[in-house]
Amino acid sequence: MPLESFLIASPALVGDQLYVGTHTGLIVCVDWRKGEFVWKYEAPRKMPFHASAVVSEDLVIAGGHDKQVHAVQRSTGKIAWTFATRAKIECSGALIDQRFFVGSGDGNLYGIDIRTGMEIWKYNAGRDITAGIAIGEGCLVVGEDQQNGRLLCFS
């Protein structure tokens, strides 16, 4: 199925629906069994989505090169909220309950309430966060330092 753009982000799959961000600033929902688009969300600034999308019960959430986290309604593809950072986002986020965690090129790891799109937690790592986030039993782990490979673990 042609997306008219190349992909860097990995797709998220829930049932028959596949969600992925593109290099041309789209987040798309595809019915992979039918090979048809369900919806397309176009970010206003049309900048790349290199971070993989995370899917909750109601939302599809992804960070973009436009320095924004975009949350779109899973059923319609309409924007629910955006959250601004100070640099592009290449880090794939993670969802814990009703909280979305994502790192940014501004050196911050953010915790966002997915019901409101509001910041509920922030940690300044001092350097770009580009590695994806891993969730374990009672902890969140992210690689922070591109120079020496430092891992940060939050419990």
List the model feature ranges, each with a label.
Residues 21, 33, 63, 75, ...:
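Glycine-rich phosphate/oxyanion-binding loops and their immediately adjacent helices
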Residues 31-35, 73-77, 113-117, 155:
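Short loop/turn segments that connect beta-strands within beta-propeller blades
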Residues 1-14, 23, 37-56, 65, ...:
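Extracytoplasmic beta-rich repeat domains
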Residues 28, 70, 110, 150-152:
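WD40 beta-propeller blade core
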